Amino acid sequence: MNFRALLVTFCGLMSSICAQALMSTSTLPEGINSPSFRFGIIDGIGQKYTESGSLMNLGDYKSVVFDAKNLAKFNSDAKRLIDALNRFGGHALGDSFNLGVLRVDTMPRVQYSAPVFARGITNRWTVGVGVPIISYTNKISLSQEFSNIEYYRQQFSGLNPELDDALNTDLSKATNETLTGKGYKALNNRDETFVGDIQVVSMYKLYEKNEKVLTYQAQVNLPTGPKFDPDDLASLNVFGRTNITNSLAYSQYLIGRLSMVPYVSYLINIPDTVTARVPLNEDDTLPDANTKEDVTRTLGNIATVGGNLFYEITDSWMVGGGYDYSTKDADRYTGERGTRYDLLATNSASTAHRVKAEITYSSVKSYFKKTAVIPLMVSFQVSDTFSGVNIERQTAQEMNLMLFF
């Protein structure tokens, strides 16, 4: 029963948390401080682009059909029931037994808020640090559909108490009982808030001449968020990671107030050690607790190429739009027991196409003209992952307020 693939499918979701804004080449003047506050919402992660690139609801993509074959693998009592039914007459009644389809529907939603502080070390070099506060909610429901259980109840109810119990199986209840028996946490709704991975950013202007700017940005993700939990199928499990993102961005004006910013970036994940349940084989979708071991995890690196366009409507208002394409390498796991570590990285390579839009209000120029009280910037961004492979459909919205002093 592939609940892990269904519920823990948010890999990469938070890798760019608090980084929904369009890439630019702006740095702070020397000695200028800029506290800011970001608030964002990420929706759409209840859908996923599959290995074929098709967009599917996770409830449809990972529904489990409980026919006789799957029941026998799932529960030893069910196998005995099937064998017993096969002995009634000559019609293979047990092999035709079907408890229907178990749907695990999820409604995950992530909100984040992040105080960020940046300072201009020189006119070319700016550093900053951000602390994301994550709010994660997920409404989880299990439902049973398309069962032929009523026919079997009519035919065989009352013959045997144990048979009656089997015929009255509640898949939702049985699922959580099975998970608990294997040491997993029950599938319940989630509503939790925690500190995510702290990010430290450095941006340096490598070149600046005639309104043409080339910048290098390094972003370090520190593993301050929750650690990987092998017993929680509904956990995000995308925090507690160390990685470094290196980016190059170039900007220049095209015509009048229209400018462009092409960029490339490469995220390097640092290997770490986590405790994981290692499947015994391809059919072992719910590994037992005794399969847990400390493994070395090397998450796939991510390469991104993209471009943005900005148009300055007035000295105070600007709009922008952009597109980027990213590709992630497959993950890799190693350990000392020599088991099927490759199964931990199944379908972990991914690609994504994303579009963004942004509108910004700035009072900075008005402040220097003595027509604004304080220098600030307020921006609103939206982004959408409109195509991909092995990645969640992510629709993000972010509001950003920046002050300067």
Language-model segments: residues:
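Cleavable N-terminal export/targeting peptides
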Residues: M1-E30
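Outer-membrane beta-barrel biogenesis signature
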Residues: A19-F97, V364-V373
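Short loop/turn motifs that connect adjacent beta-strands in outer-membrane beta-barrel proteins
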Residues: Q20-N33, G120-R124, N138-I140, Y207-L214, ...
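Extracellular loop and loop/strand-boundary signature of outer-membrane beta-barrel proteins
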Residues: M23, L99-R103, G183-N189, D229-N237, ...
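Transmembrane beta-strands of outer-membrane beta-barrel pores
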Residues: F39-I45, V131-T137, D197, L206, ...
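Outer membrane beta-barrel transmembrane domains
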Residues: S52-L71, Y151-N160, D164-N176, T273-F405
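Residues that define the transmembrane beta-barrel architecture of outer-membrane proteins
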Residues: P108-S113, T193-I198, K212, V238-I244, ...
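Residues on the lipid-exposed face of transmembrane beta-strands in outer-membrane beta-barrel proteins
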Residues: P115-R119, V129, V200-Y204, A218, ...
